[in-house]
Amino acid sequence: MGNKYEIPMDPVFQSTVMNIYWAVRELIANARDAQRRGEGEMVVKYLPRWQTLRIATLGIQLPMSTLVLGTSGAREREDNIGQFGEGLIMSLKTLALLVLMGHIEGVKVFNNREHWTPTIEYSPKWGQEILVVTTRKARKPSGEFSI
């Protein structure tokens, strides 16, 4: 197994604030911003065989610390399409994950050398259900961050 990271985010919050269209838009905008900054190549592709929408930034791997809400290294950039910098957007990626999980079964994240599996689990520490991301090493690097 891998490491488990608890993200104290109430699953009910996402259904009252965000929707699936917002989540997909934010993930695409974030990938586009990374590409415009020369940090990777954006890929948005529908795979009909698997009924899967792939949103990826090729050539990057994000550290787990980017899941911390409110962090950003690019917050002041005016050339971003997304509303926030990459680090803060990762927080929004976390929120987008939660939103997607509320609408789609089997959301997966590939982060170059790791696979991240998001789940909703009860946390005795927080006394409620929260988002939990479990990581495990990939058999071979994917060379990308994709959801």
Where on the chain are the PLM-derived regions?
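Conserved phosphate-chemistry cores used by DNA topoisomerases
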Residues: F13-R32, L47-L53, T57, K137-I147
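Conserved short strand/loop->alpha-helix "switch" segment adjacent to the catalytic nucleotide/phosphoryl-transfer site
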Residues: G2-I28, G73-N80
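Flexible, glycine-/charge-rich segments associated with ATP-binding catalytic modules
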Residues: M1, T94-N112, W116-I147
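Flexible ATP-lid and adjacent glycine-rich G1/G2 motifs of the Bergerat
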Residues: T52-P118
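Conserved ATP-binding N-box helix of the HATPase_c
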Residues: S15-V44, G87-L98
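Non-catalytic, low-structured ubiquitin/UBL-interacting segments
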Residues: I7-M9, V43-W50
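Short amphipathic alpha-helical surface micro-motifs
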Residues: R37, F84-E86, Q128-V132
